[in-house]
């Protein structure tokens, strides 16, 4: 690694991002004894300017370099495959390639078609993000409790939401389906939970910032992600409804809890040309109590909203606990 690479501010190893405590070191040691540390592949960094202001004016999203992310990601994926297989062999059948590919097939059957998203789900060892007593269900397409009245989302819902962020709008004259966009540069996740969705996002985005308001879950996500050595995730403890203005603007925002509306602070932090996906509560009689809403920022004061399918998420709350 060159001296220039060492001096880069991002990406950093997770150890450089979060505080390491003695108890967590012991937990990491116990995890490593059963599952070797796995380095997940990440897309190459794309060029973006430093944000000096804590409340920057919205502008175009970070620049993307076509082709670079795909090429580097393919090499990294090849290198990590051997490490993943070795780690999963030590962990037992529940973490085998067969189990992970069976999950990918279930997610695909549920309607997720983007090859990048399916590959990302297939690389992330979901059993590391659930309690040991639920590990046998980790590769089912099901939401599972993670404590504190929160859940790890269904993989098909995770895939669906990320897929929507990756898709481009079709041109008015286009006859075909939507065309996939270039990999995301900077993503904000509201609601880290156990860290699973952030891990999947890290496979399709250059930088992932994730906020959790529940301190024990924030600590759990740090512990879950540390053995995977994911270099492009930054975890934050705080009020997700306020977003993360110091790191804005984001070319994608994904919200993992349902509010009555999308907080204005999050809309303000979305780059022009960016997309936000969130579950929103509805009051329609006879309809779903929540539905996914896709918001596209088309100008400084111009937003376009599209209501999608019904979903069920935990409620979006303010403050920290």
From Swiss-Prot:
The cross-references to PROSITE patterns, in alphabetical order and at most eight, read: PCMT
Q: Carries keyword Transmembrane?
A: no
Reactions it catalyzes:
[protein]-L-isoaspartate + S-adenosyl-L-methionine = [protein]-L-isoaspartate alpha-methyl ester + S-adenosyl-L-homocysteine
Q: Note the InterPro entries from the entry.
A: PCMT, SAM-dependent_MTases_sf
Q: Which GO terms describe its biological process?
A: methylation; protein modification process; protein repair
Output the Gene Ontology terms for molecular function.
protein-L-isoaspartate (D-aspartate) O-methyltransferase activity
Where do the catalytic residues lie?
Answer: 153
- Record's compositionally biased regions (Basic and acidic residues): 21-31
Report the GO terms under cellular component. cytoplasm
Where in the cell does this protein reside? Cytoplasm
Report the principal subcellular site.
cytoplasm
Show the ranges annotated as biased composition (Low complexity).
41-56
Q: What are the record keywords, sorted? A: Cytoplasm, Methyltransferase, S-adenosyl-L-methionine, Transferase
EC numbers on record: 2.1.1.77
User: Where is the stretch described as Disordered?
Assistant: 21-65
Family that this chain belongs to: Belongs to the methyltransferase superfamily. L-isoaspartyl/D-aspartyl protein methyltransferase family.
Instruction: Please give the function described in this protein's UniProt entry.
Output: Catalyzes the methyl esterification of L-isoaspartyl residues in peptides and proteins that result from spontaneous decomposition of normal L-aspartyl and L-asparaginyl residues. It plays a role in the repair and/or degradation of damaged proteins.
Return the protein name: Protein-L-isoaspartate O-methyltransferase
Q: Which gene encodes it?
A: pcm
